[in-house]
Amino acid sequence: MNFNPHDYQDYAIRYIKKHPVAAVLLDMGLGKTIISLTAVYDLLFDSFEVRRVLVVAPLRVARDTWPAEIQKWEHLRDLTYAVAVGTPKERKAALMQQADITIINRENIQWLIDESGFPFDFDMVIIDELSSFKNHKSKRFKSLMKIRPRIHRIIGLTGTPSSNGLMDLWAEFKVLDMGERLGRFITQYRTNYFMPDKRNGEIIYSYKPLPYAEDAIYRRISDITISMKSTDHLKMPELVSTEYEVQLSDTERSRYEDLKQELILQLPDGEVTAANAASLTGKLSQLANGAIYADTGEVIEFHDRKLDALEDIIEAANEKPLLVAYWFRHDLSRIKNRFNVREIKTNRDIADWNAGKIPVAVIHPASAGHGLNLQAGGSTLVWFGLTWSLELYQQTNARLWRQGQESGTVVIQHIITKGTIDERIVKALSKKEMTQTALIDAVKADLEVG
């Protein structure tokens, strides 16, 4: 197939070639893989600035998406590639090929650098999903930083540069510029841009940005960062986001509050800390959805309000396909017990959904990530159980709200239990979206000028 780049794609290709260090923030559906591969091809065979390229990506993307893109496009036919996933023996066989491009999953970057026995002779690295390196304490981050000075060109690709706020940006940009813009040390970054938020005496559990932090941080990174939002460059369907509120009965409300107090009383000193907040909110989310795991692992049913709401939504859809996102295993069990649904797990499931053969499909956000195209099968997504992760939330929504969606409108419905933690999750997602949008807008490329 011949590649005829859109103007924004041509701009991004030129940007990558011009900037040895770059953060390329491309929204889902904008073709970041073909953009990167085209730039790599030119750097390898036109300007001869690069000799070997390493691509680091999530497993499914490394195994399936990158090889498929290389094979798809006519202008890339001279590229050789090897996929270093699977067993150590299979990975070593891939490395021995000395291909132009070696593609490895992010879980194995530490193995490659510290354990494989192969010299690290890649002069260009592409990180597909820069947010994979947001944790500066992770083994993959530390391993990559060890050999970072040997890398002449590095590109970070992501559509979600600050899913959980500004703090994540330090590690992501340290990988790229070795601390030139946001500082060499996380303590320095915290001191410059943040102040303690939640604390217990001398123990600080979280930080909040100083009033000037966002603008200052965005200015610091703007010279190596470009961003192009999907809605600016593609004919995207209209996105309609709605909330379907359900109300607990007085008895259920009392039980919810009682269980909440029990959970709090079980905490050390009755205090919610950063260490136990995740566990607590997880249990409250279960209650909001209608069931909770007991300490024995048994599922205790609490209410059917969300199931009732889902029944109403299915009926109102009038056989129009629905994609339902769940979070807990008991969500899935209860949905399956009540409705005739099918999980999206295999290639056959994906094909049948896109062919319109599945009236109601269920999917977990963690399995709805990169490279999963479901837009041909429907245009309505129902969130039965919410997630705190903006990255998973947006990736799941983008399975339907993307280029190629034939419906003029995509509807995202959230089933919210009033007076529960659901309302806080929706608010948190909104706040994170604002932070991320501010980042993207602050460093957006001006295509007319560029």
Predicted regions located by residue number:
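Conserved pre-motif I regulatory segment
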Residues: M1-L25
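Conserved P-loop NTPase motor "coupling/switch" region that bridges the ATPase
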Residues: R52, D78, Q97, M124, ...
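SF2 helicase motor core recognition
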Residues: I109-E115, N164-L166, Y326, H330-R334, ...
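A conserved SF2-helicase RecA2
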Residues: W388-G450
